Structure formats: structure tokens, C-alpha cells
């Protein structure tokens, strides 16, 4: 009889486990890593532009 509660808990956990097919991907889905990379790249570009020295223009990135 000790196994019954454990068995019931396991049965309850199985349907709630994440599955690879839980949300089918569409062509518009973009991985979060790509958003993170884009945000990081944008912040780096803004940082470089803000710290650009006006006297020595070659230190400024183009754009």
C-alpha cells in the first residue's frame, strides 16, 4: 500500500512534463538566443557611439 501514493504522484507528474511537441514551431518563431544577441549587439554599438572621441574620428565606429 505504500507504493500507491507514489504511483499516483508519478501519474500526475507525467502529463505536466514538458514535451518537445508541446508547442509546434512556426516559420515566425525565432530562438531567444537570437534576440539576446541582437540586443547585446545594439547595446555595444550604442556604447561605442556614446564613448566616441570627437577629436580622433578613426576611433568612432561607422554608422
Curated annotation (Swiss-Prot):
Expressed by the venom duct. Residues 23-50 form a propeptide. It is found in: Secreted. GO terms for cellular component: extracellular region. Pfam families: Chi-conotoxin (PF16981). Keywords: Amidation, Disulfide bond, Secreted, Signal, Toxin. The keyword Disulfide bond applies. It comes from the Eukaryota. Disulfide bonds: none annotated. InterPro entries: T-conotoxin (IPR031565). GO terms for molecular function: toxin activity. Contains 2 disulfide bonds that can be either 'C1-C3, C2-C4' or 'C1-C4, C2-C3', since these disulfide connectivities have been observed for conotoxins with cysteine framework V (for examples, see AC P0DQQ7 and AC P81755). The modification Proline amide is found at residue 62. Coiled coil: none annotated. Residues 1-22 form the signal peptide. Belongs to the conotoxin T superfamily. The cysteine framework is V (CC-CC). This is Conotoxin Vi5.1a.
